[in-house]
Amino acid sequence: MLVGFIHGVMNTDNTTISGETIDYGPCAFMDVFDPATVFSSIDERGRYAYGNQPQILQWNLARLAEALLPLFDDNSDAAVEAATEVLSGFTAAYERHWADGMAAKLGIAAPDRALAEDVLKLMRLQTVDFTRFFRALSAGTARTLFTEPEPFDAWAARREALLPADRAAVAAAMDRANPVYIPRNHRVEEALAAATDGEMGPFRRLADVVSRPFQERPGLEDYAGPAPVSRTPYVTYCGT
């Protein structure tokens, strides 16, 4: 969630008991921030949209709990009560980790949920690229990403009051939390198309770029940039 990753088909058989997702077929990374972002061709109703993923994971956990109920207690009511108690803690645990992660991305010392949610709303309303925004924020150039910067200016003033004194250290810490490179969808398609034709160079190049996602390197500006404007939405498939 903190890097804009969308699994695509995050159902129960693609979620392991260890809490990890698997089977990355139609997965993709979000460009412009929008909680409703869906790429998978089979997700017609947006069940596994970016913003739904936390709730989907909780739902998957509930299905696991149902399968384990006989092991919790011989009394079915007691078993359900025990499972419900554990599952009820998911939302608070997720939100705590999300808030901590957003604080690191924003460079503030302590989580501020309102500050984080407000800037995400601005990004959605003004179609700002999710990954580029946070790197631009640490570089002091985020204002240029907004077509109407005044709301961002007001938000930035609130953030300014929460920043630690050592701004250079803040920027360095933010760059350790915010990737400059992600597997941009158009780059993935480029690599797939070339590999299909027997040319592995673009894949190896992309793999090298994203293997060090936080380290900005000269000559890789095209890999940090947004996807070209497309007339048709990007679609992924289970075979991808």
Regions found by a protein language model. Name each.
Residues F39, E44-T240:
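Regulatory N- and C-terminal appendages and interdomain linkers associated
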Residues L2-H7, N11-P70:
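Catalytic activation segment of kinase domains across protein kinase-like and atypical kinase folds
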